[in-house]
Amino acid sequence: MERIFFYEDRNFQGRCYECSSECSDLSSYFNRCNSIRVENGNWILYEQPSYRGHQYYLWKGEYPDFQRWMGFNEYIKSCRFIPNHHGQYKMRIYERGDFQGKMMEFSDDCPNTYDRFSFRDIHSCNVSEGHWMFYEEPNYRGRQYYLRPGEYRKFSDWGASTARIGSFRRVHHMF
């Protein structure tokens, strides 16, 4: 069973809230979040309610302060469990919105998009199989964006404010 524990203070101190399913608004359970323990599963955490704001991808392990999950501050207001995926991974990326322009298909990780293909930005994407993470910078750094199967006609559909993607990878379950 998937489980995540949120702590108000660093090093797993202060008020604690246990969660075992997605939650669109964590505000009533804690005011701030400075440490997290993921007991099982992969999770996406969001800085704002209703799955908005900065996104953070966490897997089984301990995160004694928000810098460990590349957090910008102590706010986590919603969370989503990433379901298991068994099978292939497949995603198409496009250099322009609405699936226009050059297209490339991927079934594996890409640590540096700038080395891999000629266009700098990803404006739209179609995820047909698996769950993926986009990162704003190469080598899986910077802002993170979770993509589940579906169509993303513009970069704001995956929560980004720009089309800049420096790397991406498949979400593998680490139980």
From Swiss-Prot:
Hydrolase as UniProt keyword: no
GO biological process, one term: visual perception
Ranges where the record places region Connecting peptide: 84-88
Record keywords: Eye lens protein, Repeat
Domain Beta/gamma crystallin 'Greek key' residue range list: 2-40, 41-83, 89-129, 130-172
Pfam families on file: Crystall
Domain of life: Eukaryota
InterPro entries, sorted: Beta/Gamma-Crystallin, Beta/gamma_crystallin, G_crystallin-like
Intrachain disulfide bonds: none
A molecular function (GO) term: structural constituent of eye lens
Self-association state and partner proteins as the record states: Monomer.
Family: Belongs to the beta/gamma-crystallin family.
Domain notes: Has a two-domain beta-structure, folded into four very similar Greek key motifs.
Function per UniProt: Crystallins are the dominant structural components of the vertebrate eye lens.
Record's protein name: Gamma-crystallin-2
Species, as recorded: Xenopus laevis
The gene coding this protein: cryg2
